[in-house]
Amino acid sequence: MQNLSSLDVKGKRVLVRVDYNVPVKDGVVQDDTRVTASLPTVNALLGAGASVVLMSHFGRPKGGPEDKYSLRPVAPVLEKVLGRPVKFIASLPGSDETLQAVQELQPGEVALLENVRFEAGEEKNNPELNQKLARLGDAFVLDAFGSAHRAHSSVSGVAAQLPHAAGTLLQTEVEALGRLIEAPESPYVVIIGGAKVSDKIKVIENLLPKVDRMLIGGGMMFTFIKARGGVIGNSLVEDDQVDYARGLLEQFGDKLMLPTDAVAADRFAADADTRVVPADQIPEGWMGLDIGPDTQQAYTEALRGAKTVFWNGPMGVFEFPAFAAGTNAVAAAVGSLKNQAYTVVGGGDSVSAINKSGKADQIDHISTGGGASLELLEGKALPGVEAMR
């Protein structure tokens, strides 16, 4: 991929696709992680004498302006973390008004465009919109790894029209995740959780031949346990994936590690009655909502001595304190490998879990891209990444 140093930006206007799809409540940004993640690229461009025009999507508007999806609340947050004024441009990104506003920018100045999904052609990679957006810069930088798997106008469409390069964040993500696929150091342990096997099929398939152990947790564990003939009560199961899970167990049984015990609940609620039971003997009318203490210990042991670790997906319904112990145990175990193993955490829920556990600073790489991380690990070519080559 071309990096920032390949662009001559002095005195030029650089259009940067960032990922500012942040949680906003009552017009206030709740978490500025994605905003601060863009600073290395923005500061590098400003330092090289450019003016910077930032472009992002936010939420899922229906191809037109909607107040609740405006990026306006992000501007003051960006000003604060950047330490300089940010000009918010409220007109549609592809409009002549926006073009006029960005043409007035001086080197060292920063503008934030309105939500690019307010343009109906954005998600269709519309050629006319691609050209309108390309007018806004002399060069284009893609730094939105979280959107790199989308062939949209603001991701790959504009790239074809302008000199382009990958931003610091995009580069870091692709290199960090690449290490999990290309010659990972052994022992290589992957922890996969979350509700559904169907969401993770391709990742599981692509990684299983490369790993030494794959630890399964979360709701998906019961599809595997049922495939082994276990009794799962009212636990979450994907019946249409049971045969598939059985096939994986037959082919990779020596690598796949399943929970031996589970925290079962009499209903799906924070204050449900709970008991620890064998994972393949969930009582009738009960449901497994977390891995049990024996499994927590076994998974912690399985991680000891690992040289490469990837974790995606929680071990249980960690939003409820009664079912968070499994996820917290994995967070602690992965965090304890600092300086011994190369550790990567990806996927929204596992990132929240690692942040909640206070272990985030002990992880080598925390991925900002949910779907994009998984698609890269599935072995897919991402349109945004390909456009930067």
UniProtKB/Swiss-Prot annotation:
Signal sequence residues: none
Annotated residues for binding of ATP: 200, 288, 319, 347-350
Key words, A-Z: ATP-binding, Cytoplasm, Glycolysis, Kinase, Nucleotide-binding, Transferase
Binding positions for substrate per the UniProt entry: 19-21, 34, 57-60, 117, 150
Gene Ontology cellular-component terms listed: cytosol
Compartment list: Cytoplasm
InterPro entries linked to this entry: Phosphoglycerate_kinase (IPR001576), Phosphoglycerate_kinase_CS (IPR015911), Phosphoglycerate_kinase_N (IPR015824), Phosphoglycerate_kinase_sf (IPR036043)
Pathway it works in: Carbohydrate degradation; glycolysis; pyruvate from D-glyceraldehyde 3-phosphate: step 2/5
Primary localization: cytoplasm
Reaction catalysis annotation: (2R)-3-phosphoglycerate + ATP = (2R)-3-phospho-glyceroyl phosphate + ADP
Record flagged with keyword Cytoplasm: yes
Gene Ontology BP annotations: gluconeogenesis; glycolytic process
Catalytic activity, EC: 2.7.2.3
Disulphide bridges, residue numbers: none
Domain of life where this protein originates: Bacteria
Family annotation (CDD domains): Phosphoglycerate_kinase
Protein family: Belongs to the phosphoglycerate kinase family.
Subunit organization: Monomer.
Name assigned to this protein: Phosphoglycerate kinase
Species: Deinococcus deserti (strain DSM 17065 / CIP 109153 / LMG 22923 / VCD115)
Gene responsible for this protein: pgk
